UniProtKB/Swiss-Prot annotation:
The lineage of its organism: Eukaryota, Metazoa, Spiralia, Lophotrochozoa, Platyhelminthes. This is 16 kDa calcium-binding protein. It comes from the Eukaryota. InterPro entries: Ca-bind_SignalingProt (IPR051581), EF-hand-dom_pair (IPR011992), EF_Hand_1_Ca_BS (IPR018247), EF_hand_dom (IPR002048). Pfam families: EF-hand_7. Keywords: Calcium, Metal-binding, Repeat. Ca(2+) 3 binds at D86, D88, S90, K92, E97. Found in eggs. Residues 2-37, 41-71, 73-108, 109-143 form the EF-hand domain. Ca(2+) 2 binds at D49, N51, D53, K55, E60.
Length: 143
């Protein structure tokens, strides 16, 4: 299946009322389901809604996704992202470092969701994410 076809399927899955548009509420619900602060929906609409009608059409959604760098470039840059989160340079990301990174990125995720996410992705159960665990999450999320 082509990447664009996958994106279209995701769009339709988020579009709960099947009206062909993503509303703030639909985007916020989707974000909440994956553990991201629903307020990020406002930022997504602001950056994606080209005709300023307060909702995102399939065309606007696909155009925004087409502007993203190719997947290979994205994966190659994840090490830089990991290192920017790993403030103490330990080679591991603590829950505190992750929380600080998310807050400075405008994502205020509740502590319970953050702990649950960390528990799910901390495969060796040492309380921190190493780069391999981080990359495994990225690869699973951005297949």
């Amino acid at each position: 299946m082509s990447e664009e076809k996958q994106w279209t399927e995701v769009f339709h899955a988020i579009d709960k009322d099947k009206n062909g548009f993503l509303t703030r509420e639909e985007i916020a619900q989707c974000l909440k389901e994956v553990g991201v602060c629903p307020n990020v929906a406002d930022k997504i609409i602001k950056e994606t809604d080209m005709n300023s009608d307060g909702k995102i059409s399939l065309e606007e959604y696909l155009n925004a996704l087409r502007k993203l760098p190719p997947r290979e470039k994205c994966v190659a840059r994840w090490r830089e992202v990991f290192q920017s989160i790993d403030k103490d340079g330990s080679g591991k990301v603590s829950i505190k470092e992750l929380d600080e990174f998310l807050k400075t990125s405008g994502m205020d995720i509740d502590q319970n969701s953050l702990r649950n996410w960390m528990t799910q992705n901390d495969k060796n159960k040492d309380g921190e994410l190493d780069y391999d665990e981080f990359l495994a999450y990225v690869r699973q999320t951005y297949k």
